[in-house]
Amino acid sequence: MDLLNTSISYNIDGAGNTTSVIAGIRGELEGRLTITANITIYPTDLDEGTTFDDLSKKQLFALATKKLPALLPTLAYTNYQFFVQNDTPVRLTAYSNLSNDGSYITLNSTLNQSDFTDKPIGSIGYEDVKSAVKTILSQEFPTS
């Protein structure tokens, strides 16, 4: 999945020091997954002796992208919706999000019968949806 940097936002304290940076991320995979995220980078995420002011936008985006795979497995699934054609479920979209330690992620996953090999799509449940999305994420983000 190609990820794009959509924004960089600096949080600055009263003394003018950058205390954290929020990097906006967006990515899409062939209409199957859409991810938007605001990942907060803290001083503890930086190499020793490095400050936020030492880093380019590209380097900050790389740090945020590096944090993303560890956050994806903790997504909470808020809803999933079946799409029906001729009274038969043909696909579903799962909506999930995370608000954790200053990072916010929204993931929309569109799944079809090929994602559920052991049962018809019309009979799948919550755990089946989570498992299918996890499989796709593990292929796109090998450490997730």
How should these model regions be labeled?
Residues 1-19, 28-144:
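Viral virion structural and adsorption modules
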Residues 23:
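Conserved two-metal-ion catalytic palm core of "right-hand" nucleic acid polymerases
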